Amino acid sequence: MDKYAVIGNPVEHSLSPVIFQAFEKQTNHSFDYLKIKAPVNGFAAAVKKFHDKGGKGANITLPFKEEAYQLADKRSQEANEAHAASALQFREDGTIYAVNYDGLGLVQDLTRNHNITLTQKSILIVGAGGATRGILGPLLNAAPEKIVIVNRTPSKAHALAKIFHLRGEIQGGGFDELEPMRYDVIIHATSLGHQGKFPPLPDGLIGSQSCCYDLSYGKIASPFLQWAKDQGAKYNFDGLGMLVEHNAAVFYLWFGIYPDTNPVIEMLQAHL
């Protein structure tokens, strides 16, 4: 039986096995899907071992996305823009193909599942790390009016804006540089939720129709989404749908079939 996996450290929390099991039943495909906890300094060896044992593909989670990108022989445009891989495909010719579907998953969840329009909208992204870099390309493809990246270290936000400046209107800066305006979409992409915190955002960023979205899901997303509700945001979503949509795109890469994500999202929401 073909073998697939999610590789990370930690990996115990991953919902990907549950999601792929649901896709497996829905599409009548049979395969094994494993959780592989790779040593922090042993990612390449873990991938080789899995590949040598017949592995066909792997989802990649923290902290290995950049290393997975470097390990690949060929890469998608999104992976090249992100300098990170969210999934690998082990091809018949022995090569490794890297993709990054994080941004695709986000845009699909916002536009298809939540009916949020991104075209000609103002988008504020909080955080300038790897998570932000992974979503910028697909967000810019949606042709927003502008994207503003804000970060505790302004130079990181400026650097990301410079990398993508030819793709659309994009700015970067620190929290004290945020111009007083109401954004259509605010995306939280920092790891502060793991500590039960959220960034020092000022009041006045949220309008009556604003959408706030945390790339994390469950309890980790709660601090930011609670702030958004307190500020009067009409639409507040965590990143559970993004994860499912990401995995649906990976499933299509591996099997050539696009699964129905709605029942899987509903199933996970009922159990989380």
UniProtKB/Swiss-Prot annotation:
UniProt keyword annotations, A-Z: Amino-acid biosynthesis, Aromatic amino acid biosynthesis, NADP, Oxidoreductase
Assigned GO CC terms: cytosol
Active site: 65 (proton acceptor)
InterPro entries in the record: Aminoacid_DH-like_N_sf (IPR046346), NAD(P)-bd_dom_sf (IPR036291), Shikimate_DH (IPR011342), Shikimate_DH-bd_N (IPR013708), Shikimate_DH_fam (IPR022893), Shikm_DH/Glu-tRNA_Rdtase (IPR006151)
SUPFAM superfamilies: Aminoacid dehydrogenase-like, N-terminal domain (SSF53223), NAD(P)-binding Rossmann-fold domains (SSF51735)
GO molecular function terms noted in the UniProt entry: NADP binding; shikimate 3-dehydrogenase (NADP+) activity
Alphabetical GO biological process terms: amino acid biosynthetic process; aromatic amino acid family biosynthetic process; chorismate biosynthetic process; shikimate metabolic process
Protein's UniProt keywords contain Amino-acid biosynthesis: yes
Residues at which shikimate binds: 14-16, 61, 102, 217
Record flagged with keyword NADP: yes
EC number: 1.1.1.25
Reaction equation(s) it catalyzes: shikimate + NADP(+) = 3-dehydroshikimate + NADPH + H(+)
Binding site for NADP(+): 127-131, 151-156, 215, 239
Transmembrane segment boundaries: none
Matching Gene3D superfamilies: Leucine Dehydrogenase, chain A, domain 1, NAD(P)-binding Rossmann-like Domain
Pathway(s) of this molecule: Metabolic intermediate biosynthesis; chorismate biosynthesis; chorismate from D-erythrose 4-phosphate and phosphoenolpyruvate: step 4/7
Family: Belongs to the shikimate dehydrogenase family.
Assembly with partners or alone: Homodimer.
Record-linked HAMAP family: Shikimate_DH_AroE
General function of this protein: Involved in the biosynthesis of the chorismate, which leads to the biosynthesis of aromatic amino acids. Catalyzes the reversible NADPH linked reduction of 3-dehydroshikimate (DHSA) to yield shikimate (SA).
Protein name (Swiss-Prot/TrEMBL): Shikimate dehydrogenase (NADP(+))
Biological source species: Coxiella burnetii (strain Dugway 5J108-111)
Gene: aroE
